[in-house]
Amino acid sequence: MTAPRTLYDKIFDDHLVDRQDDGTCLLYIDRHLVHEVTSPQAFEGLRMAGRAVRHPEKTLAVVDHNVPTSPDRKFGIKNEESRIQVEALAKNAVDFGIEYYNEADRRQGIVHIVGPEQGFTLPGMTIVCGDSHTSTHGAFGALAHGIGTSEVEHVLATQTLIQRKAKNMLVQVDGKLPDGVTAKDIILAIIGEIGTAGGTGHVIEYAGEAIRSLSMEGRMTVCNMSIEGGARAGMIAPDETTYAYIKDRPRAPKGAAWEMARAYWETLHTDEGAHFDRVVKLDAANLPPIVTWGSSPEDVVSVTGYVPNADEIQDETKRLSKKRALEYMGLTAGTKITDIALDRVFIGSCTNGRIEDLRAAAKIAEGRKVHPRINAMIVPGSGLVKAQAEAEGLDKIFIEAGFDWREPGCSMCLAMNDDRLKPGERCASTSNRNFEGRQGFKGRTHLVSPAMAAAAAIAGHFVDIREWK
């Protein structure tokens, strides 16, 4: 009888090709997602070595990081470096026989939104991409994580990846989420609890009543930010919610293949008594809407709280780090979070650019107007999300309220396209990183949920969404 295994153990074992005496492992990779930023050198390496892509049918290429999101993007990309990267991906996709969604394809969008939409992401799979937020796909009970450019080339050439097995970590979130508290607040609370290095060397499995109650889109939000907690990957065991989301997707199994796949998926759960190297527990009932105040995702505080006093931190290194964060963010200790005035609001990204996120924001925006000082933008995560939102009339709600309705792409999550903050601008953002300069040189980022961002756009400052009338 085999020892009890975790979900991570099972998927890792099922894909193990070889294990060396020193613990180095070779894993088979089921799915490889590719975008324009981390792939050019990888494809050039294949070309120079005279190699083909081993399994083009297991590879999907999408442009997302560099593409403009303005309505006039059909006229081309102005930035030369961005244009070259996008053109290179188009050429490489043709040369190597890979399916490719360009900016004119309605299926185009952020790679981590497109994969699940197409049924390319399935439970029990190993999934990689040259992007740290590949952990998003772990919401389906997949082992998904980012890889570097040299590893991108290795996977393209061999459909395998050299790895060492990570440790197991369980994050148990029990209880019922209060009204106004979302999946984004769950993951920000987790990162606030464990810190940005808390998951280092581990794969996190998220479990508990609050996690099970989330939709697939909420689960993707949680898994998306596993890397911000330092983890190699994050995952949630599949269940009926998972199967309902996947069924009838374009790339999902059909007929008898579906039944066979589902039978396997139902084995993908952690066995009773399986060992976790670390266990963290949170009570969802006690979670508030959360806002980040500093320049790290671990710098979290309740919307009803105050900017902390760095001088009260005992550890000298951490104290100096938080003092720098306060200086960079232009904040004074003791300031009420709801007194922080904003300049910009960004709703989108692979964390919160899905249809449920837009619905949540539209519910707040309907019948209201964006504050005169605020420049607010809504960027759907894919062309299909945009089409669905427009079919539901969400675009009209946003436009009438004064939001800018954009085309799909990574947009202001990172300063690699035309959407970026100016120095000193302060933004409420539904993205995943608030590092210095992440959204633009000297830009100041506060991470929040879509509903919190929409309310901030209207009020001009942060508000407690639980008291929103």
UniProtKB/Swiss-Prot annotation:
Q: What domain of life does the UniProt record list for this protein's source?
A: Bacteria
Tell me the keywords, alphabetical order.
Answer: 4Fe-4S, Amino-acid biosynthesis, Branched-chain amino acid biosynthesis, Iron, Iron-sulfur, Leucine biosynthesis, Lyase, Metal-binding
Any signal peptide, and if so, which residues? none
**Cofactor dependency:** [4Fe-4S] cluster
GO molecular-function terms, A-Z: 3-isopropylmalate dehydratase activity; 4 iron, 4 sulfur cluster binding; metal ion binding
**Gene3D superfamilies, from UniProt?**
Aconitase, domain 3 (3.30.499.10)
**Catalysed reactions, semicolon-separated:** (2R,3S)-3-isopropylmalate = (2S)-2-isopropylmalate
NCBIfam families in alphabetical order: leuC (TIGR00170), PRK05478.1 (NF004016), PRK12466.1 (NF009116)
Which PANTHER family does the record associate with it?
3-ISOPROPYLMALATE DEHYDRATASE, HOMOACONITASE, MITOCHONDRIAL-RELATED
Its quaternary structure? Heterodimer of LeuC and LeuD.
Name the record gives this protein: 3-isopropylmalate dehydratase large subunit
Q: Which gene holds the coding sequence for this protein?
A: leuC
